[in-house]
Amino acid sequence: MAEIKAFRGLRFTDKAGSTGEVCCPPYDIISPEQKKQYLAENPHNIIRLELPKTAEDTDEAYGKARAYLNEWLDEEILKCDEKPSIYIYEMVFDALGSSYSVKGYVSLVKLEEFSKGIILPHEETLSKAKEDRFNLMCATGCNFSQIYSLYMDDDNKVFTLIDNASKGVPDKQFTDPDGVTHKLWCVSDEAFIADLASKMADKKLYIADGHHRYETALRYKKFVAENKQDVGTSEYVTMMLVNMENSGLVVFPTHRIVRDLENFDVNAVIEKSKDYFDIETNLSRTDSTAKLDKAYKDGKKAFVLYCDGKYTLMTLKDTSLMEKLMPTASKALRELDVSVLHTLVLERIFGIDKENMANQKNLTYTRVLDEAIEAVDNGSADCSFILNPTRVSEIRDVALAGEKMPQKSTYFYPKLTTGLVMNKIFD
């Protein structure tokens, strides 16, 4: 099963500046303007290496990232730890009116093809994003950020082990602009590392966030094997590993925004939907949110259509309909809210096919409810769909069935910060 390994983490030294100034959110949620802001605050921010190329840059940006990396290594702005270590990582945050803590650990994980069933994906990926990550790995030979993965540990033995090893003052700690406190402990004790590896040896891993980076790491592993004598740690990738039963795991919904449809008629859409859904129209925002939440708690498949200032709750009448529409899919996949929306509404009623969805021609995504509403109100979108979050158990069940959810089915919050610890693949 999963093989984990300690590594000599590449970390910023005090020469770089404060920890909070050199870390940033994941590259794929940072705009060119935000990148400039991070670098204005501190020119050593990890975004200079992790996101060298934006829409404004050419492919030469990857080479520049390598040059900066070498410069920072020479100046000891970045430095590898002396001993192979496991890095215990905790995020403390507020969400949905409550306080949470999620604690896991960062290690190397041996790369495995998905077909082996050891490391399991749950979402589809886009080729453009993978090409960018591959070019960056080839240029720098580093994992700058971690793949976020989950494992099952019903008796909590792994968590107890890492929790006991992180009782002292963290090696690094900062609070980001969103109010999330990030803590990191470096543990090099060989007995601890061996015990952790043993406890993980029977476990499957479920990728929560970072599918593009994992598939890129698989490709890079093959590239190195074919082109280099020294493979370094290219047969591994860095992951943040968290118990699937951790009470701090928070998944936000990702809402759908539909735009640029020809002859869009919301009344016709609602009329067609009545064959498949129980419809409640003319709801207020407050009522629609409350009813959507109740549907979630009751295990019903539902979402809210927003158009012309009106909220319409759509609740699937009969889940057996999805079996007819997705006959080869598992029960876990076809009964997801996003599967019902994509297959029954977007494809069947709206006529938006899978390729269109992948290219985001008529469909875009946001986790911010106000953005989904504002896009309709300002006329840039025809309508939007407000969804409930996907359950962690649903992610597990789809992955175990060997299937993948539609893109943007999950949004784990908070996102892992980038810059606390990295992996330099070659010494």
Each model region followed by its residue ranges:
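Surface-exposed, charge/polar-rich loops and edge strands
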Residues: 1-427
